[in-house]
Regions:
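C-terminal segments of enzyme domains that contribute to small-molecule binding surfaces
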Residues: 139-161, 189-202
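Domain-scale signature associated with acetyltransferase and cell-envelope carbohydrate enzymes
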Residues: 1-126, 147-148, 166, 182, ...
Length: 202
């Protein structure tokens, strides 16, 4: 069961950001979690968004959600474990399907990041759709799309412009810089094809 402090924070948070929230879903979190949501940001919640799914609140690691001006989250029913660090910059959009993301993840959304349904994503995962800084006079910002039923191992990083096809598997420790074909296994730095026509089950 969640602690009383966490339950109180859930109620207060959903009341405080009621003008930002559209739909029937709610924000779930623990007592130490930190939210900074601009008044023009929008959370379109068809289902619940669990920022910290540690119901006992014993891990001591808070989750952070920052949404800058005119940013949007569209969510079906998505769960983070503890230690989530999610930032949406101005005018960006994060689309979350019915999936699960383990502890200590980082999401940096400058433009568009999509995570589909039925994904299982391990701990220490990072995804970013921008280089964040200029290099040789340019700043690369391109959408990232993670399809449905994707298995992502621990300590994987996915960089801007990548599309991960449905049913794909990404091995632990990989850095993904190019598209991943559906139902393929990739791994390495940078990630390369290891096997095609793979099938996996939870």
């Amino acid at each position: 069961m969640r602690t009383l402090k966490s339950l109180v924070k859930i109620i207060c948070t959903n009341v405080r950001y009621r003008n930002n929230i559209q739909g029937r879903g709610k924000i779930g979190l623990c007592s130490g979690d930190c939210l900074k949501i601009d008044r023009t940001a929008k959370l379109a919640l068809k289902g619940n968004l669990h920022l910290n799914n540690d119901k006992d609140g014993n891990n001591g690691r808070s989750s952070i959600l920052r949404m800058d001006a005119n940013s949007t989250i569209e969510c079906q029913n998505f769960s983070f474990t503890y230690g989530a660090d999610v930032i949406l910059f101005k005018n960006s959009k994060l689309v979350l399907g019915n999936s699960y993301l383990n502890s200590n993840c980082k999401i940096r959304c400058h433009n568009l990041i999509t995570i589909g349904d039925g994904c299982v994503i391990s701990h220490d995962f990072t995804v970013m759709d921008s280089d964040a800084h200029e290099l040789d006079g340019s700043r690369n910002t391109n959408p990232v799309h993670i399809g449905n039923h994707v298995w992502i191992g621990t300590r994987v990083t996915i960089l801007n412009g990548v599309t991960v096809g449905d049913g794909a598997v990404i091995a632990a420790g990989s850095v993904v810089t190019k598209d991943v074909a559906p139902n393929s296994l990739v791994g390495g730095v940078p990630a390369k094809m290891i096997k095609s026509k793979v099938e996996w089950k939870v």
